[in-house]
Amino acid sequence: MNPLKDRISEAVLKSIENIGTVGIDLPIRIEYSRDEKFGDYACTIAMDREWRSAAAAVHPEFTNPRKFAEAIVKSLQSAKGYAELFDSAEIAGPGFINLRLTPSLLEACTREAVREGTGYGRTARSQPKSIIFEFVSANPTGPLNIVSARSAALGDSCCNLLEAAGDRVHREYYVNDYGNQVDLLGRSCLLRMLESEGAKLKFAIKDHKGDYSYPAGPGLPFPPEGYHGEYLIEIVQLILGENPGLKPPADVIRRAKELSKRSDNAGDPIEQLELASLADDLGKRATEYFLSTHKLDLSRFRVRFDGFYSERSLHESHEVLAAKDRLGERVFTDGEGKILFRSTDYGDDKDRVIVRDDGRPTYLLADIAYHYTKIKRKFDRIYNIWGPDHHGYIARLAGAMQAMGYPSEDFRVLIAQQVNLLEDGKPVVMSKRTGKFITMKTLIEEIPIDVTRYFFVMRSFEAHLDFDFNLARDTSEKNPYYYVAYAHARIRSIFRKAAERGLIPAEAVGRPELLLELKSSPIEMTEERRRLYWLVARLPEEVRDAADSIEPHRIVNYLYSLATALSRFYAPTENRIIDQEPSTAVSLLILLGGVAACLKNGLGLLGMEAPERMTREEV
């Protein structure tokens, strides 16, 4: 079944063509009514200046939005099939068209939801797009943190929605396994290894100006920007356990211990001990280890990837330096010998260095090379999720994409804003380098995955998220996930109770589509029932709209509205199913079966489960 908005748009377009206004290629906006007492949908076409101007070329009086709306409604009401789709079409204000759907159409949509089951909400596109969606892409220099967890939940949900809307999606993780951060990781691991053998370390302190200085006294200087977390001690022991030959010789360890006793040592201990190659090796091994833990944690978090693309592979295949030639005339060499990309031609605030004066490529050039592989793989659209600290990076990469011939409208970067952790109303401070942070692994061991994913997608990308641990641990309906989950579990409880009372066959509990074969009676379309019918009918377009706008939080809002409508449905005694005659009970259970399908499918698209049973169930 096509989304209702599509059917309404087609009907409105035909009505416009029937009044002699044809050949206008403009979109028709169909919105939900702000106040449902006026209708289900609102069409603002008569208020659109472009539409009025185009229509007035044939009918000059259509410059008046009210007259344009009156003509559309009159044509709509006289069209074949109007009565099957619309219960009413009325004009409000200067030219808004309010549309109300027929009860029979809403009932048909609900029966379709029950019939399709887990497939309801999915649609097909006439021209599906192939999309590469890159997300998480966290540096493999430590465990995944809670910020990466949000990116994972958002990205996975977006991909699910795009696939449900009919597109083909390739999910990719870009592995930053090359460069300065990997070097720092290797050096940090090596110093922790020497510490485990008895050498002392000392750590730099940052002052109020942001400058680092080491405290007086003995110790091997630890890199100020290195990874301070004590989790590295365990990682080093794991690496040594699998590769005992990596342990430095006894004389080197002795020298390291002696060096660490000196108070006047300000040099690089790794260079002094001639252990640079070992540090490089440890950096590679540590990144491999952390990447393996990333994959495991993401799998546990129900996040799927189709590919992991290594930055190191780009450097080893010489694709990075070759990428500067992809930018054509948009590169130049300055007086210091650096090669720059003219990113100011594309809205950046300054031109960017892509090759340093010593011939080494910058991270930007590596990123350009990686994105060129996406172009070569012929994806129709390229989507990325980045963290809030990368906002200023968008213009330069978007400019590079244009310079390489990729359409700007098909490249999009979504910024996942910061996660603020709250415990007992107080903020929890995080830092991967200092080791003071909550890992994804710890999070999903303490908070159920369903709750965690719900919290991470319930706000838009651009909204900061307050993750309240106290609320996340709460299993009552104050927790928004459980509010929605209870709604599904309650329906399933009602189905089981109806079978126990003999109102429906036991087989229909697990296969609600069997209800469609049973005798049912017409039921009064009360306000509470109608709202449920309408919300069930909306799921396909809610999914499609959320996919098109890349806004998974819209599905969260929809599910919460559906659960709220269900709660109101239970209030009148006339909706108490176990007190009904069998044929009336079947009709109400078909409605609830449609609601359950929407709750389950909506949660599923966001990577969450809809429980069959919960401790608190009501009939």
Residue ranges and their predicted role:
Residues 2-107, 115-118, 122-619:
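Non-catalytic interaction-recognition regions
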